[in-house]
Amino acid sequence: MGDLAYWPAAKPLSKKNTFAKNRDFIKNLDHIDQIWEKLKFKCGDTLAVCDLRGKYKEKFSYSELADLITKVSSSFENYGLKKGDVVTVISENSPRWLAVDQGLMRLGAINAVRGINSPSVELDYIIGHSNSVGLIVQSKEIWLKLNNKEELKKRLKFIINLEDEQFESLISWSTFISSVEKENSQNNNLEKFNPEIDDVATILYTSGTTGKPKGVPLTHANFLHQIINLAYIADPEPGTSVLSVLPIWHSYERSAEYFFFSCGCSQYYTIPKFLKDDITQIKPVVMATVPRLWEAIHDGFFQALKKMPSKKQKLIKFLISNSSVFKRSLRRIRNLDINQITFKSKIPLLGSVISRYPLHKLSTIFLCPNILKQLCGEKLKFPINGGGALPEHVAVSYTHLTLPTSVIV
């Protein structure tokens, strides 16, 4: 690998904190991929992952997924992969991406990841800079956009096509996973590769907008820190529905997914184009999001509001405005704003809160639930916003709808 900037694992939270129930096994892991055998026995029949919009719309229980990961890992070994080897993976969210990711980790191998919309020159650079010995592409179209195909065919141990198409010298997915003998496919040789917590798990590359992409290795310790410490503030039950719309190769989405999987949640993959449909169909309890997504939902609601009859528009806007002033006044009285106020200044605000409360209460009973049902599928309790703060007007709107967004920056 070329010169890489290592990001040290953060220190764990104080042991005085009570660890989330039924999750003590996480503390004793050295590798992310070790969670699957634990989850296989803890919640094996629970749906682990479902691809709503992918080519094959595959879904797997935790037991099925654990077995697939073991099989994929054995197949990689059969193709000559060993601990410390790097494989470039160019693909978007799918159960196959997840199986490849965890199968590589099972061997102690490393993946250099990127999305399918990256420029070809950027993808060429990542494959070379990471010293990859193998390549995995989502489809033949991704393979065709690369510039040095002939050189890659000679140098790489394998080039795998996740979408299973037979094309040139690419190895189809079905051929790849059937390359290992059945009796060995369920043989979990985890300890043979001497997993260590400081092993590099993945290399994430920047977009390259200010020059060549920069590779940042993350270790298993980095990811395990996230899994362990997020459990102190959230502990969803097995089977809790999670809708995943962000790219899985992004560090924030990836860390969130590992955490949700460690809880036994059921994750559904979608894409932004179908988010509105899938959020009402799946009715997720948890979502990992970014500000732009909430802005789009917010703007979509107010665009839809414009199409309503004039009287209905005015009524809804009045009720939202009333709740807006009520919530803002209440925050200031409680000194939750940055600029705190004196007791004397709180007196007129208290009058505003008292006078606006009845209509606000009616809104929370009759208006807000209907709006939230249309926007978020009625069950969303933990919308996690990462990567930056919400614009103030968007944050205020969701707060008025009694939808708190947990922020992780």
Predicted regions and their residues:
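Conserved AMP-binding A3 loop
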Residues: 59-63, 201-227
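Conserved ATP-dependent adenylate/AMP-binding module captured primarily in the ANL superfamily
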Residues: 116-148, 226-243, 273-286, 374-376
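AMP-dependent adenylate-forming
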Residues: 8-18, 35-60
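Structural core segment of the AMP-binding/adenylate-forming
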Residues: 1, 106-179
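Single conserved hydrophobic/aromatic residue that forms the stacking wall/gate
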Residues: 400-409
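Conserved pre-ATP/AMP-binding loop-to-beta segment of ANL
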Residues: 161, 181-205, 212, 235-241
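Conserved AMP-binding/adenylation subdomain of ANL enzymes
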Residues: 224-241, 248-344, 349-369, 379
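Conserved AMP-binding/adenylate-forming core of the ANL superfamily
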Residues: 48-102, 119-124, 181, 220
